[in-house]
Structures are given as structure tokens and as C-alpha cells.
Amino acid sequence: LRAVMKFLPFYLITSLFVWSSAVYGQVSQILEDEAVAWLQGLIRVDTINPPGNETRAVEFFADIFDAEGISYETAESAPGRGNIWAKIEGGDEPALILLQHTDVVPAEEEFWTIDPLSGDIRDGYILGRGARDMKGLGIIQLATFLSLHRSGVELNRDVIFLATADEEAGGFFGVGWLIDNHPEIFEDVGFLLNEGGGGSSDEGDIVFGVEVTQKVPVWLRLTAIDTPGHGSSPRPQTAVTRIVQALNTLLENPFPPRIIGPVNDYFAALSVDMNEEWGPSYADINSAIQDPAFVEKLHANRAGHNSLIRDTCSMTRMSGSSKINVIPPTAWAELDCRILPDKPAEQFIAELDELIGYTGVEIETIMAFTPAISETNSRLFDAIVSVTQELHPGSRVIPSVSTGFTDSHFTRDLGIVSYGFNPLITESGEHTGVHGNDEQVREAAFRQAVTDYYAVVRNVVID
């Protein structure tokens, strides 16, 4: 065999290597190298939203698909707002979508130590806006999709690669638009993998969070109207004081804690590795939240977990007069509210109106999604558990609830079982820079995630 291999062309050896690795559930060093290069290249494609310009990313993927001989379709929801999808056909089982968004949030270059669109590797890390959110996972999905294509193995279901626009601004030019204008993409789809989960390692203890639901964003504008006047003659009540009064009422009356099923499961799983200070409370979180002292301590020390036990509203924008010496006729404030997915937005808004309605402010809904939860009794979730435990002995998989939102809420509304899963392992204390400065992903962890993601998907799509 060695003698035969000696005279084979390099490209054929490469193809055999990739094929044999794919057949046995692994990806090759060659594909890992390609994935690193692809991620660097995709980071360099400017898709900062606003304005998005995701068609640039569509062209990036189209070039790769053309080289691989893979057919694909594209559609713009607006000029420059491109979406692309491709399919590997398989058997009659409900299809699997690998979903990613190609837009990224802005980066304030003066606070970075490197060009945010450089994609350079420094000290073992790939840097740039989107390295983690979510061009990194997008390339991991691409590597899996191409591995399946190159292997030529028979699949039990269709596998769809879907890269979309606008998630960072709500997804209305991406998945939301595609559901309305290209519903055929989502027909006969049973499973979807998206962002929202991740792996963490603390002194070798590895935990993979799989997002099964998320808090529902309810973005609101409070508006007050009152008599205008000169700033030199203060009035006892103005549009501005009404807004201040409403906001102060919100501050003084936090929404009461309550526990939904996925949060209870999540806290119970976390309790296993916690010390005596936190472990018993997390193990029985329903009882723990009855103690105001615990709730206060949780809020002070673990803000993210506090957000999982109650509805929240962050005060993010305000406006009053355009001049310092004018009492304005109107004033407004905007709230980023996130509610647990066990109640509709309409009920939450009615409760909010009961709380602050006495101030005379009007509540306007800017954006609100519908709540949905993906159950864990599925072949896909079982595959995530079994494969990650095989690849990382002793690791655990925890169903998690995201305080942020992803495009999965759109697909859950269609009845598609949608999980946020990313096998990328982040070490305790490791800088990530997601939505911040010097966003980065450890190259070694990224390479491992390429292998792990493919193994999970392969388990589901090959009998």
C-alpha cells in the first residue's frame, strides 16, 4: 500500500484521506486546516450590521460550493441582504438544518488591539469580529456539510446548510423573511442546529450547554405627554417626570421570581459541581427563591442566573427636550424586556401596565416574539449526549435557557426541534470578546470543535 501511495497524485491522496476520515466519523487534519483558513477569510468579509451587506458572505460561500460542485440557491431580502442555502439529499427521515447568521455586531476599533476584520492568528487565537458570534460556528457547520458531501455516504435524511442575514437586528431580513418568502426551505424539516449553546471547562470538568429555549424579547417604548413650558418655571408634573416616575417604579418593583421547567433542570445540573454556598440552593431552586436573601445574593453575584428566574427590563434609551431650557411636551424611554417563555408578551405588557399605568405613560410594542421550548426527548439530543461523552469522557450535557435570543424562535414556531449547540470548549477565565473587544477563539479548541460537530451530525444522519 505504501508503494502504491507513493505514486498517487497528491490531490488523490488528499481525497482518500478526507473520504476515509469522514466514513469513520472524524474529519481530517486537512479539513481542519481548511476550516481555519475559511474562518480567517470569512472574518475578513465585512458584514457588520448595520448595514449588514450579507451578500458578501453569500458570495464567499458560493465560491466554495462552486469549487465543490454543490448546487445552491440565494435570495436577497433587500439590496445587499443576502441569504444562501444548499442541500445534500438523503432518505425520508425529517431533514436537518444547519443554521447560521452571517452578520456581526459593530466593533469600536479604537478599543481593539488588532484590526477587527483581520482574522489574524495571535498567540494561538483566531481574532476578529464574528470569531465566536457566529462565523466560527458557521465555518464548523460548513466543514461538517462538506465532509458529508465529500464522503458520498448515504444519508437517512436531507441535510440543509442555511446562512442568513440580520440575526443581530432581529432576523427580519433573514430567517423571518425566508419563512414568508421561501417556505419550501423549512418543509419536512424535523431538526435544526443553531447557535446558543457551548462547552466550558473548569479544571478539566467539561460541560456542554444545549440551548432548548430562550427568554422572549419584548422591546417597548414608554411615551408621556404633558404641558410644555420654560425651564425657568418648573411644573409639578411634566412629560419627563412622568417617564422618570414610571422608570423609578420599575426599579423599585422587580418582577417576582418564578421557575420554569428547563431552568429548574439547568440549575439542578449546575448544582452538582457547586460548593456548599450555592449547591444546595441550586439543587432546589424552587425553594431557594422563596428566601429574599438568596434572591438578593443571586442578583448581586450572578446576574445572568438571576435573569433566568424572572422577567427583566433594562432601561436602555431615553429622550426628552432638544434644548436644556425647554420643558418638552413629550418624553420617551425604551426598555429591553426579556420574559420567561411561559407567558405571552400580551400578558406581560398587561402586567406592566398595571404596575406603571398610574403615571399616565403609554406603552408601545416595538418588537415581541412568541415563546417556544424544544423538548430533549429526541434523537438529535441523544446524539449530542452520547457523542460528546464518547469524545470527552466524564463530560456532561445540560439543557440550557438563553437570556438572549437567536433565530431559533422562528423555527420553533414552525414546530421544528431547534437546539443551540456548539461543541467549542472555552476554558474557565478565557477571554472571548463576544460583542466586545478583541473577539477571539482558541485555534486548538476550534479545530476540536470541527471534529466534534461532524461526529454529532453524522450520528444523526447516517444509520
Where do the protein language model's features map onto the residues?
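Short amphipathic alpha-helices in soluble, non-transmembrane regions
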Residues: 237, 348-356
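An extended, acidic, His-containing surface patch that forms the Zn2+-binding/catalytic region
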Residues: 90, 198-203, 256-322, 329, ...
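N-terminal signal peptide c-region/cleavage motif recognized by signal peptidases
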Residues: 20-22
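A short core secondary-structure module
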Residues: 176-178, 232-256
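Acidic/histidine-rich catalytic neighborhood of metal-dependent amide-processing enzymes
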Residues: 126, 132-209
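Bacterial N-terminal signal peptides that target proteins for export
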Residues: 1-12
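Acidic/His- and Gly-rich active-site-bordering loop/insert found
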Residues: 26-129, 148-157, 335
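Acidic/histidine-rich, surface-exposed loop or edge segments in extracytoplasmic proteins
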Residues: 37-47, 223-226, 359-367
